């Protein structure tokens, strides 16, 4: 049994070798000749999987170690009788922590408290729900918009997108990319929406590039609209609009979900799905794969305020470390993908063990996802 895996999927060689012969290949472009005798294909979001790639090939199963699936023609796979699995929620925590790292940086730079801001969350799935929970644990007001969930009657106080635009100081997008249909998200943030944002608002896109109309956004910024922008995703990736990058406050190469934990979850989820598909079901404990974190433990004295939280968050991950490298190489062919391929290891907040002498600080840090314990000062 031959299994092709994206060369940038961590732990894929070790895990899938339990099930068959593993060949690691680049994801963009994928070497088509390797598909001629392969039984399974494991990809990331950079690989378009459709009829033109797989027609006439012996592939029986496709797995994507990503939460999003807009790079997969699921309808064709089903029609062709090819098994499929994604990894929903695998990188949700990573994306939430990327948003926090960005917001805390902007708050420090511009001198505001997050408690004074209302956050509008567009898309309330695995990422949106976790973001809502962590913001509300800090006492920050959130507004939710998710028309598909609202129409299904899912639990939640859902508002219209127009209401979020009117009332939110921060608008952050966490939707799939739907190019048509009743819940179309292509250019959901169009020129009209962008121009309608509150003066001084913060716009964040960490889902799919085309959810925000990049041309319209650049037009608004060039005209001097007072707006802070955080973009992790771009229309036309791996190409991007260099002029837009110059105008945004934070720009990164589609790495919001790139924690070691998130990548490992993605790999293990598709591994478990494929093992079940072939009748050799196996389960993997994530902590058996992950290395020891760089920072073992730290001690925190006193209550948890915003500057202290910012220091803790940026100790684990400071978004500026990914902004600067992109600006250095933007516009050079191949460099966007190279930054992703050679991405510096990044951990989640749970990897940081925090000893607190303040019980409320320990409790709040646990709610936020840190590994925190209370030890009273002596």
Curated annotation (Swiss-Prot):
GO BP of this protein: 'de novo' pyridoxal 5'-phosphate biosynthetic process; pyridoxine biosynthetic process
Main localization of the protein described in the UniProt heading: cytoplasm
Binding site for NAD(+): 146, 175, 232, 257
Pathway membership, UniProt: Cofactor biosynthesis; pyridoxine 5'-phosphate biosynthesis; pyridoxine 5'-phosphate from D-erythrose 4-phosphate: step 2/5
Record carries keyword S-adenosyl-L-methionine: no
Pfam families: 2-Hacid_dh, 2-Hacid_dh_C, DUF3410
Catalytic site positions: 208, 237, 254
Protein localization: Cytoplasm
Entry's Gene Ontology molecular function annotations: 4-phosphoerythronate dehydrogenase activity; NAD binding; protein dimerization activity
Xref: InterPro entries: D-isomer_2_OHA_DH_cat_dom, D-isomer_DH_CS, D-isomer_DH_CS1, D-isomer_DH_NAD-bd, Erythronate-4-P_DHase, Erythronate-4-P_DHase_dimer, NAD(P)-bd_dom_sf, PdxB_dimer_sf
EC number: 1.1.1.290
Catalytic activity: 4-phospho-D-erythronate + NAD(+) = (R)-3-hydroxy-2-oxo-4-phosphooxybutanoate + NADH + H(+)
Family annotation (SUPFAM superfamilies): Formate/glycerate dehydrogenase catalytic domain-like, NAD(P)-binding Rossmann-fold domains
One Gene Ontology CC term in the entry: cytosol
Binding positions for substrate per the UniProt entry: 45, 66, 258
Keywords attached to this entry: Cytoplasm, NAD, Oxidoreductase, Pyridoxine biosynthesis
UniProt subunit comment: Homodimer.
Family per similarity comment: Belongs to the D-isomer specific 2-hydroxyacid dehydrogenase family. PdxB subfamily.
Purpose: Catalyzes the oxidation of erythronate-4-phosphate to 3-hydroxy-2-oxo-4-phosphonooxybutanoate.
Protein name: Erythronate-4-phosphate dehydrogenase
Organism: Escherichia coli O7:K1 (strain IAI39 / ExPEC)
Lineage: Bacteria, Pseudomonadati, Pseudomonadota, Gammaproteobacteria, Enterobacterales
């Amino acid at each position: 049994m031959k299994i092709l895996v994206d060369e940038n999927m961590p732990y894929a060689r070790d895990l899938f070798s339990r099930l068959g012969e593993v060949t690691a290949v680049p994801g963009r472009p994928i070497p088509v000749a390797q598909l001629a005798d392969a039984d399974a294909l494991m990809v990331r979001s950079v690989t378009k999987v459709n009829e033109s790639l797989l027609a006439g090939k012996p592939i029986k199963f496709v797995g994507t170690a990503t939460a999003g699936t807009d790079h997969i023609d699921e309808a064709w796979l089903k029609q062709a009788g090819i098994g499929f699995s994604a990894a929903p929620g695998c990188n949700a925590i990573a994306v939430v922590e990327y948003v926090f790292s960005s917001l805390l940086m902007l708050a420090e730079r511009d001198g505001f408290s997050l408690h004074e801001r209302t956050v509008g969350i567009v898309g309330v799935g695995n990422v949106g729900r976790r973001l809502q929970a962590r913001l509300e644990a800090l006492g920050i007001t959130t507004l939710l918009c998710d028309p598909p969930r609202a129409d299904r009657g899912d639990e939640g106080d859902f508002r219209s997108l127009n209401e979020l635009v009117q009332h939110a100081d921060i608008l952050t997008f966490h939707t799939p990319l739907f190019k048509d249909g009743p819940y179309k998200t292509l250019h959901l943030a169009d020129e009209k929406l962008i121009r309608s944002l509150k003066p001084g608002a913060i716009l964040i896109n960490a889902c799919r590039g085309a959810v925000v109309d990049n041309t319209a956004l650049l037009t608004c910024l060039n005209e001097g609209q007072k707006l802070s922008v955080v973009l992790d995703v771009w229309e036309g990736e791996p190409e991007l609009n260099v002029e837009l990058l110059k105008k945004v406050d934070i720009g990164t190469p589609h790495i919001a979900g790139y924690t070691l934990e998130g990548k490992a979850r993605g790999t293990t989820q598709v591994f478990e799905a494929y093992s079940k598909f072939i009748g050799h079901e196996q389960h993997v404990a994530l902590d058996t794969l992950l290395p020891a974190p760089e920072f073992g433990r730290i001690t925190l004295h006193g209550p948890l305020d915003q500057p202290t939280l910012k220091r803790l968050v940026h100790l684990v991950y400071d978004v500026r470390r990914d902004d600067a490298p992109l600006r250095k190489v933007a516009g050079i062919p191949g460099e966007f993908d190279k930054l992703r391929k050679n991405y510096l290891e990044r951990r989640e907040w749970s990897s940081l063990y925090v000893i607190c002498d303040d019980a409320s600080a320990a409790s709040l840090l646990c709610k936020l996802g840190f590994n925190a314990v209370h030890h009273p000062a002596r």
